[in-house]
Amino acid sequence: MFGTFLQNQSVRLNMVCAPWLLAVVVVCVCNPGVEGQCWDSSHCKDLPSEDKILECIHLFRSGLQDESPEPRSAAQQSTEESLSLGILLAALTSGERALDADPEPHSDKRHSYSMEHFRWGKPIGHKRRPIKVYASSLEGGDSSEGTFPLQARRQLSSWEDEMVGALGNQGAKAQTKVVPRTLTVTGLQDKKDGSYRMGHFRWGSPTAIKRYGGFMKPYTQQSHKPLITLLKHVTLKNEQ
């Protein structure tokens, strides 16, 4: 695409430059006296620099202007001028027409630029594995297990197992998710009515033995032997 654009620009530049070059050639052909007389003389030959060449041309121009021109009729001058103007106008108009007319007009014929060399040019879906057809199965006419390759059979069996497992998991999830609404409502009401007990924690409902770290036992579990012995001692002292 970029190459075609450069070609179009170069063609346009050539079309524009051609008429101007033609105009310069016409001017030089109409007035050949200056360059011819300058380069024919011995003064302008073998000049070392461009400045001296320009000075030489300037001197010869001034000399030509001082000389009296040859007598020409008005008809000849008018015909020469009309010819030169006609050539210049024809060249300029042809250049303008070439600029206006596009060499490759924008139409539907131009192909759309498809970015096939990029990986996002043509997005491809899931890659489909090609199905391999073996000549032995075609020649035999039947697809028996002996002719079918072992690797392909293993792949098919693994794919079937995966599909069955995925379907089973989906069914189990669906069964666990489907819960009656009445049961959930009654469970929420029971929780609201009763006290919240942290049964899911280890310390939610500890046993009586392990309560308070096992150091403090309840009154019912304490032995009454020390109290009985104390009363016995008191009664014996009072009797004495």
Swiss-Prot record:
Pituitary and hypothalamus of adult diploid animals. The modification N-acetylserine is found at residue 112. The keyword Hydrolase does not apply. It is found in: Secreted. GO terms for biological process: neuropeptide signaling pathway. The modification Isoleucine amide is found at residue 124. Residues 1-36 form the signal peptide. Specific enzymatic cleavages at paired basic residues yield the different active peptides. InterPro entries: Mcrtin_ACTH_cent, Melanocortin_N, Opioid_neuropept, PMOC, POMC-derived_peptides. Its main location: secreted. Residues 111 form a propeptide. GO terms for cellular component: extracellular region. Pfam families: ACTH_domain (PF00976), NPP (PF08384), Op_neuropeptide (PF08035). GO terms for molecular function: neuropeptide hormone activity. The modification Pyrrolidone carboxylic acid is found at residue 37. Keywords: Acetylation, Amidation, Cleavage on pair of basic residues, Endorphin, Hormone, Pyrrolidone carboxylic acid, Secreted, Signal. Belongs to the POMC family. Melanocyte-stimulating hormone alpha: Anorexigenic peptide. Increases the pigmentation of skin by increasing melanin production in melanocytes. This is Pro-opiomelanocortin B.
